Amino acid sequence: MATAALLRSIRRREVVSSPFSAYRCLSSSGKASLNSSYLGQNFRSFSRAFSSKPAGNDVIGIDLGTTNSCVAVMEGKNPKVIENAEGARTTPSVVAFNTKGELLVGTPAKRQAVTNPTNTVSGTKRLIGRKFDDPQTQKEMKMVPYKIVRAPNGDAWVEANGQQYSPSQIGAFILTKMKETAEAYLGKSVTKAVVTVPAYFNDAQRQATKDAGRIAGLDVERIINEPTAAALSYGMTNKEGLIAVFDLGGGTFDVSVLEISNGVFEVKATNGDTFLGGEDFDNALLDFLVNEFKTTEGIDLAKDRLALQRLREAAEKAKIELSSTSQTEINLPFITADASGAKHFNITLTRSRFETLVNHLIERTRDPCKNCLKDAGISAKEVDEVLLVGGMTRVPKVQSIVAEIFGKSPSKGVNPDEAVAMGAALQGGILRGDVKELLLLDVTPLSLGIETLGGVFTRLITRNTTIPTKKSQVFSTAADNQTQVGIRVLQGEREMATDNKLLGEFDLVGIPPSPRGVPQIEVTFDIDANGIVTVSAKDKTTGKVQQITIRSSGGLSEDDIQKMVREAELHAQKDKERKELIDTKNTADTTIYSIEKSLGEYREKIPSEIAKEIEDAVADLRSASSGDDLNEIKAKIEAANKAVSKIGEHMSGGSGGGSAPGGGSEGGSDQAPEAEYEEVKK
């Protein structure tokens, strides 16, 4: 028995007639009126800014990518991408732990990957929200140089330097880097962000991404889909019409169809593959190179982690070069060695050969595109513009496939690497109230429902329903005198419950004993603007209600998250202490140089005991600065400066007949300035 009781559904035809307050979660109030997420105010109480800078009210936009990440902020009515400390506009999504236990993020981490492959973690976005037993996880384990392990809750975690980390934790390290990049630019602390995710991410993956933000000390104001964010950045200049966004990034593929009209961005449909991206292209090329070397030299490089990492980086570089050239050389001297001596790897790779190797991957983008157009109820001819997003869309073969699918050349109107972050910053501007003329109506990518009698998946909310939304349906018991009902919440498109993703389960107890089919149990699904689901079950006879915000059967517990927040703060504190130590050592070097220069100039004019005292102080400072005791180095800097000040005291006393060095007397040419030094604040 399943009598539908529809509470509310936001559809296209309601956009005009519905009061604007119905979409308040996207308006200037910045508060989600339909938001029933479990996070709510609790996340704000635990979010901390790991910075001593003054608090700011900016909402930054972060594209947390599989391969690269990017951060942007609103300047007036326009989004601006912020360069990182290395001067780049994107940051590699790579985290490493070196032998000293130091945490490296971004370019420094990627740079040392060849010599430290097992402790350098990348591409963890593909693991976020996934189980260890997931077939995709098992596939990924064979491709990465680091260890993927089973967490106590059954999730897929990674291991580095003997310690286990959740993908959310690794994501948090990258988000922290993005946060610090924004803070350095703005000159104030940042605690709020809009973070993007692939449109085809399920609820567990969205929750895990939000957890990553929380661990990084960020209150994630909104999770938005990457293609939607790209469309926002494209459409902010009053563009209108039907837009298809083809987003092929480092690890995931999404395609969305949107209609832009009078500042309203309405997502009509979305589709994709969360395990298709640049990493798969790299791996296809890597397999080819390994096999080529095995054929010519009889050595399997797949068994040599260091050689494999060098080859992986060469494959990625070759892939990038072949987007703009017809052929490239891969030269890796001393890649390995055997009894006959050192072996070198040298091969010429043509674009046509590369395209042959990855053609099966490119072809996998066809079906999601066709299904997306079908769900949107339009033909390819009706699409006005096709936007390319993600670094992999620079591959000429990908562009030709897009042109073939949609019947038109794709637009180059957005930067494939930066459009998503810019759109996220725009959404932040909408939430803050700085951007009032844009309204975003997104959709849920997958159907949501429960398991009913016979193991059937009964949908309550179908895919591509505009969010936020809330729907209910009345069910009954399957047996006589049944006093409790188990509610299994699922997400997917298969007809049988076991073939779909189990998001969570709970029990409604205390149902009065009755014949089967008599009790009235109302199940309600509520999806907020982040795409996060709350499910409740109500016995209409007794009024008893059981409600949960969906957490995957794995996922991070509250204790896990708080522990990781503390660890993130500890890492931030260690980084701060390390920077202070380096700055103080630099000050010590400058002090030594200046004192020795002054001593050289005035040695003949001061008593030998003063010169000896200064030399001893410099020797002590040099010895201290070779160690890591911050307080000792500071004390020795102070002692050295006190010793060198005696030159000035002696000279001002008239012993050398000159005026006081560094003093205010007129005409003194032989002045001995004290050593330059910079006081490092604690």
Curated annotation (Swiss-Prot):
Induction and repression of expression: By heat shock.
Gene3D superfamilies found in the cross-reference section: 1.20.1270.10, 3.30.420.40, Actin, Chain A, domain 4 (3.90.640.10), Substrate Binding Domain Of DNAk, Chain A, domain 1 (2.60.34.10)
Similarity annotation: Belongs to the heat shock protein 70 (TC 1.A.33) family. DnaK subfamily.
Keyword Signal attached: no
Acidic residues composition-biased segments: 673-682
Known function: Chaperone involved in the maturation of iron-sulfur [Fe-S] cluster-containing proteins. Has a low intrinsic ATPase activity which is markedly stimulated by HSCB and ISU1. In cooperation with other chaperones, Hsp70s are key components that facilitate folding of de novo synthesized proteins, assist translocation of precursor proteins into organelles, and are responsible for degradation of damaged protein under stress conditions.
Extent of the transit peptide: 1-50
Keyword flag Protein biosynthesis: no
Gene: HSP70-10
Assigned keywords, A-Z: ATP-binding, Chaperone, Mitochondrion, Nucleotide-binding, Stress response, Transit peptide
GO molecular function per UniProt: ATP binding; ATP-dependent protein folding chaperone; unfolded protein binding
The name this protein goes by in its record: Heat shock 70 kDa protein 10, mitochondrial
Pfam families membership: HSP70
InterPro entries per the UniProt record, alphabetical: ATPase_NBD, Chaperone_DnaK, Heat_shock_70_CS, HSP70_C_sf, HSP70_peptide-bd_sf, Hsp_70_fam
Comp. bias intervals (Gly residues): 651-667
Start and end residues of each stretch annotated as Disordered: 646-682
Biological processes, Gene Ontology terms: response to heat; response to virus
SUPFAM superfamilies: Actin-like ATPase domain (SSF53067), Heat shock protein 70kD (HSP70), peptide-binding domain (SSF100920)
Coiled-coil positions: none
Organism listed in the record: Arabidopsis thaliana (Mouse-ear cress)
Compartments (UniProt record): Mitochondrion
